């Protein structure tokens, strides 16, 4: 919906949303970062006329979107993003502002889930400690807890690409749910110890990126980059096994994470109705 790797028209986003609804899907996820606010704006427009208690919606905080006309036609994989510059900020005030900005873009007062987006060394490298201090000493977690306590958000958690930072966060705050992208899939299960911990803690896991950025549905992307040869070979081996049992590889990839008791949902990142 935000235009990752190629443009997505409003008509395509509308058709995808309507097809999902027709097939019984009622959980929709977005983020300010996706399309540099485009995804939130589109999803809000497509859902705002439906009964609010008929669906679940989640978004994320951790980047403020600052108006900037110098944003190029393609940035960070987003094609034709809107003119807003993503700026990391996990402090108390920034989390609240991000939430309020999302409310307006979505046209929704109460959110079902608010995730802290992309905290961790995978995203921030040697700047991770700086941003982690913003979440802890800087009050980011406190803002999340206040939003939940006030009823403006039903559940809080993390939306990340790595397992280690989730375990750190579970020691800092009582989080309800974690969106984990690409780390418990048919191709990669390095986060299995985290999932076992979440079962014990009663923390739900939403699996994102079940196709590892597309490599499991036939394109050459893995972890948002061109897939290395060893990954391609592993996928070919998985496909051979699936072919033996007459099961499409994408179907196996989609069903695999749902078998774990920690996993409460799976988001696929569909761009069109097909």
Kindly give the residue locations of the regions a language model identified.
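Short, acidic/polar
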Residues: 7-20, 91-105, 161-168
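Short amphipathic alpha-helices and their capping/turn segments at secondary-structure boundaries
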Residues: 40-56, 95-110, 191-204
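N-terminal binding-site loop/beta-alpha segment at the start of enzyme catalytic domains
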Residues: 1-70, 77
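Beta/alpha (TIM)-barrel catalytic core signal, keyed to glycine-rich beta->alpha loops juxtaposed to Asp/Glu
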Residues: 12, 36, 46, 119-274
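Surface-exposed, active-site-proximal loop segments in enzymatic domains
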Residues: 67-87, 122-129
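Glycine-centered flexible beta-alpha turn that most often forms the glycine-rich phosphate-binding loop
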Residues: 28, 111, 156
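Active-site groove signature of glycoside hydrolases
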Residues: 103-126
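Active-site mouth loops of central-metabolism enzymes
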Residues: 1-11, 80-96, 128-132, 228
């Amino acid at each position: 919906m935000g235009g990752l790797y190629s443009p997505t028209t409003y008509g395509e986003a509308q058709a995808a949303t309507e097809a999902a609804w027709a097939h019984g899907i009622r959980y929709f996820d977005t983020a300010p970062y996706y399309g540099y606010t485009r995804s939130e704006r589109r999803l809000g427009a497509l859902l705002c006329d439906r009964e609010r208690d008929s669906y679940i919606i989640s978004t994320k905080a951790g980047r403020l979107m600052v108006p900037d006309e110098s944003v190029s036609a393609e940035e960070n994989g987003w094609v034709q993003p809107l003119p807003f510059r993503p700026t990391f900020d996990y402090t108390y005030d920034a989390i609240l502002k991000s939430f309020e900005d999302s409310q307006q873009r979505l046209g929704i007062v109460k959110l079902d889930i608010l995730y802290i987006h992309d905290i961790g060394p995978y995203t921030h490298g040697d700047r991770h400690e700086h941003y982690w201090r913003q979440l802890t000493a800087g009050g980011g977690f406190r803002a999340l807890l206040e939003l939940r306590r006030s009823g403006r958000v039903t559940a809080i958690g993390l939306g990340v690409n790595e397992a280690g930072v989730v375990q750190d966060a579970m020691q800092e705050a009582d989080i309800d749910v974690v969106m984990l992208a690409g780390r418990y899939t048919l191709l990669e299960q390095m986060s299995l110890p985290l999932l076992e911990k979440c079962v014990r803690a009663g923390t739900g896991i939403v699996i994102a990126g079940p196709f590892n950025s597309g490599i499991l549905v036939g394109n050459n992307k893995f972890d948002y980059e061109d897939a290395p040869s060893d990954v391609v070979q592993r996928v070919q081996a998985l496909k051979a096994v699936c072919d033996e049992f007459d099961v499409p590889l994408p179907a196996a990839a989609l069903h695999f994470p749902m078998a774990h008791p920690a996993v409460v949902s799976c988001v696929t990142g569909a761009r069109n109705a097909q």
